[in-house]
């Protein structure tokens, strides 16, 4: 209670929190606004039947969108196009020397340029996905011309309902762009990472349905190991606790590199250098690799699923990339490891750290300053990142294993077993750290209470 009073006693922090929650509430309103021309009840019934059948791609998409996908609403695409666009732009930076040079010479201008490129790619990807979404809705007979704008939605050109396609593309693309704008506003003026908070909000919104699935499937009196009984429930709870602890451990874990400071002369006095350490995070990328890997696999799989009835090879691709399959699991693990290294390489700057240490007279015992320090930091970070990447992949892949062993619905295993839990816990910890830093600047005890010297009030 004392911490909450501290949080809300600071006017600026209180305004940031209120601003963040207000925009997140606006996101949830979009879940209840259907795409014009689509029968919402028929769509929900169809997806309920589909989602209850097996571990399907649409289950993961529905969790990411907070239930908007199954209801076919204006924000059904969620922020997946934005995340895919961010991946494309980050890869372009790596493979285009001109962008790298611009980022080094004018970081602010480079960031603005990357932001414009990300928005452009988001627009293009959202248009493509919403077009496929409209085609899928027509094929599944989920469109009822006459629900909204009866005259316009019934118009056809060469037998193709062009107005319906145009309406769906405009509405759903606008929904994605609105979510992107909200995420950027939260990151700039609120608390936490806006896009990550939107994803987390959608996942938390599916928690009641997860609990409902557990209790509907639970059969306490059954002795059949193939049914979901008390033993399966206890195993599920144990896995939930393990994933929770492992997530906190992997996100908060650091490798402490000892640092010694040289003697300095201040005025006429010689001050002895003290010892400290440089913390290298075990998982420097946080939950970014999980979000990137899930979104990247979701994009081609969604296209294959939408067009599977028109091509046998697309149907095979959709089946292979369906969550829970062996191919999906292999790609998922490899992508998590790749994006962990990729994000660490783009964000961790050993040459800058080595340069700052040399300027401040700091050194690592047994390692010369300058280039040797940079090489040592790169070597150490690569080893630490490997451990973090493998651990992250193991925790993230638990849902498919859990679903097969315990025979629970995919939404339960996704939420309690790995992917969703990693994202939710990681984003919550990151947001708490931002609030903690905000409080410490003003000499308050942080939200994440640790033993630390207190400043004067």
Swiss-Prot record:
Keywords: Cell inner membrane, Cell membrane, Membrane, Protein transport, Translocation, Transmembrane, Transmembrane helix, Transport. The central subunit of the protein translocation channel SecYEG. Consists of two halves formed by TMs 1-5 and 6-10. These two domains form a lateral gate at the front which open onto the bilayer between TMs 2 and 7, and are clamped together by SecE at the back. The channel is closed by both a pore ring composed of hydrophobic SecY resides and a short helix (helix 2A) on the extracellular side of the membrane which forms a plug. The plug probably moves laterally to allow the channel to open. The ring and the pore may move independently. It holds the Pfam family SecY. HAMAP family: SecY (MF_01465). It comes from the Bacteria. One of its GO terms (biological process) is protein transport by the Sec complex. The chain crosses the membrane at residues 17-37, 75-95, 120-140, 163-183, 195-215, 230-250, 287-307, 326-346, 386-406, 412-432. GO terms for cellular component: plasma membrane. Belongs to the SecY/SEC61-alpha family. It is found in: Cell inner membrane. It comes from Chlamydia muridarum (strain MoPn / Nigg). InterPro entries: SecY, SecY/SEC61-alpha, SecY_CS, SecY_dom_sf. This is Protein translocase subunit SecY. The keyword Transport applies. It is a multi-pass membrane protein. The gene is secY. The lineage of its organism: Bacteria, Pseudomonadati, Chlamydiota, Chlamydiia, Chlamydiales. Coiled coil: none annotated. Component of the Sec protein translocase complex. Heterotrimer consisting of SecY, SecE and SecG subunits. The heterotrimers can form oligomers, although 1 heterotrimer is thought to be able to translocate proteins. Interacts with the ribosome. Interacts with SecDF, and other proteins may be involved. Interacts with SecA.
């Amino acid at each position: 209670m004392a911490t909450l009073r501290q949080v809300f006693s600071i006017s600026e922090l209180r305004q940031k929190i209120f601003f963040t929650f207000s925009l997140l509430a606006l996101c949830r309103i979009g879940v209840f606004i259907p795409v014009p021309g689509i029968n919402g009840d028929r769509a929900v019934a169809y997806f309920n039947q589909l989602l209850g059948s097996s571990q399907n791609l649409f289950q993961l998409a529905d969790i990411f969108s907070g239930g908007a996908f199954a209801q076919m609403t204006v924000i059904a695409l969620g922020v997946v196009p934005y995340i895919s666009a961010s991946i494309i732009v980050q890869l372009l930076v790596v493979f285009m020397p001109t962008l790298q040079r611009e980022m080094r010479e004018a970081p602010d201008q480079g960031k603005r340029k990357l932001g414009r490129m990300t928005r452009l790619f988001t627009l293009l990807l959202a248009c493509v996905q919403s077009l496929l979404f409209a085609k899928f809705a027509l094929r599944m007979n989920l469109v009822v011309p006459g629900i909204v704008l009866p005259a316009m939605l019934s118009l056809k050109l060469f037998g193709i309902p062009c107005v319906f396609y145009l309406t769906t593309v405009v509405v759903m693309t606008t929904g994605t762009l609105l979510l992107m704008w909200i995420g950027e506003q939260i990151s700039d003026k609120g608390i936490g990472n806006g896009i990550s908070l939107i994803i987390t909000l959608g996942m938390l919104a599916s928690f009641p349905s997860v609990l409902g699935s557990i209790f509907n499937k639970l059969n306490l009196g059954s002795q059949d190991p193939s049914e979901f009984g008390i033993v399966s429930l206890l195993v599920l709870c144990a896995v939930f606790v393990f994933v929770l602890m492992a997530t906190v451990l992997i996100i908060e874990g650091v490798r402490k590199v000892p640092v010694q400071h040289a003697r300095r002369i201040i005025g006429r006095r010689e001050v002895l250098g003290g010892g400290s350490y440089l913390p290298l995070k075990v998982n420097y990328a946080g939950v970014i690799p999980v979000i990137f890997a899930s979104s990247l696999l979701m994009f081609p799989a969604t296209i294959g699923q939408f067009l599977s009835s028109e091509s046998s090879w697309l149907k095979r691709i959709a089946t292979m990339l369906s969550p829970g399959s062996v191919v999906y699991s292999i790609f998922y693990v490899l992508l998590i490891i790749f994006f962990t290294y990729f994000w660490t390489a783009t964000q961790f700057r050993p040459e800058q750290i080595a340069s700052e240490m040399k300027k401040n007279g700091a050194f690592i015992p047994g390692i010369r300053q300058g280039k040797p320090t940079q090489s040592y930091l790169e070597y150490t970070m690569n080893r630490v990142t490997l451990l973090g990447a493998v651990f992250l992949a193991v925790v993230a892949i638990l849902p498919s294993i859990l679903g097969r062993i315990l025979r629970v619905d995919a939404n339960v295993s996704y939420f309690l077993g790995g992917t969703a839990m990693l994202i939710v816990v990681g984003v919550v910890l990151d947001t708490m750290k931002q609030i903690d830093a905000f409080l410490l600047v003003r000499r308050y005890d942080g939200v994440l209470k640790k033993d630390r010297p207190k400043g004067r009030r």
